[in-house]
């Protein structure tokens, strides 16, 4: 068995919309399966900044237009983005494995992060989510 390889994919590397993400995960899956084919155990972690931002904007817009839908908390938007990024990666990897006649299990796992609301980092955020906008 080869080495365990951990791959970190930034959310920006996955595109700025769903069609771009589908292209990115297909290309990424080929490289990942190359590593698996070489005998490595592969673990993938991914970012979700642009994706969670798009979901947050969509959910906020829905809430403004239909008050029966409350604004989704960031934890829910994060889980939604992890789920759809994860399933797209999982499906692309599984398809690439299938094309190569390789029987390897692939799983998506959602994660949770606990933060201290009093953390000094909240005073000067450095990690944006969603679209960038110019100050007016």
Model-derived features: positions:
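Generic domain-boundary/flexible-linker signal
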Residues: 53-54, 119
């Amino acid at each position: 068995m080869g080495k365990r390889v951990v791959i970190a994919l930034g959310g920006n590397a996955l595109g700025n919309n769903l069609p771009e993400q589908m292209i990115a995960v297909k290309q990424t899956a080929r490289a990942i399966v190359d590593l698996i084919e070489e005998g490595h155990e592969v673990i993938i972690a991914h970012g979700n900044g642009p994706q969670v931002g798009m979901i947050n904007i969509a959910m906020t817009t829905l809430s403004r237009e239909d008050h029966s839908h409350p604004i989704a908390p960031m934890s829910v938007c994060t889980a939604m983005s992890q789920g759809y990024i994860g399933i797209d990666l999982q499906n692309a990897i599984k398809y690439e494995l299938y094309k190569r006649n390789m029987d390897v299990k692939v799983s998506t796992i959602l994660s949770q992060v606990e933060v201290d609301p009093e953390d000094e980092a909240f005073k000067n955020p450095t990690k944006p989510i969603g679209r960038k906008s110019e100050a007016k």
